[in-house]
Amino acid sequence: MTTLYVDADACPVRAEAERVATRHRLRMAVVSNGGLRPSQNPLVETVIVPDGPDVADQWIAERAGRGDVVITADIPLAAKCVEAGARVLRHNGEAFTPANIGQQLAMRDLMADLRAANPLGAGGGGKPFSKADRARFLDALEREIRAAQRDAQG
C-alpha cells in the first residue's frame, strides 16, 4: 500500500498533502523532531523523532520504498529514497528522479563549497513560496501518487 511520507521541517504544503492523501485514502506519515500540532485525521500519523542531525531523514529513508511518495527539500534524503524506489517531490512540485538526483547532489555540494569559501557573503535565502508553486505541487503530487500506486501493484 502506498504511503505518503512528509519531511515536515519547514514544509509549507503539509495541509495540501493531507488533503490529497485523504482523497486517495493513503496513509500519511508526517515526520519531525517536534513542534507540530498532530492531525485529527486517522490516516495521518505524526511521528516525532529524537532531536539530532538527520534523525527525521533517517526515519523516512529506512521506511520509504517502491510504491511510496516522499515530500522533502533535503537532497541527500531524496537520493536515498529515489535509490530505494520511492517517488520524491520538493514542496514546489519538482520531482527528484534517478535521472536528475546525481546532478542535484553535485549542485548541492558545489553550493555548500561556495558558501564555505565566502563566509561573509550575503545569504539571501530562497524565493517566497507562491500560489503557482502550490498549484504546481498539487498537480505533481496527484501525478506521483497515481504512479506510485501503479508501482506498488507491480
From Swiss-Prot:
One Pfam family this sequence matches: DUF188
InterPro entries: UPF0178
NCBIfam families: PRK00124.1 (NF001095)
HAMAP family: UPF0178
UniProt similarity note: Belongs to the UPF0178 family.
Name the record gives this protein: UPF0178 protein SPO3827
Biological source species: Ruegeria pomeroyi (strain ATCC 700808 / DSM 15171 / DSS-3)
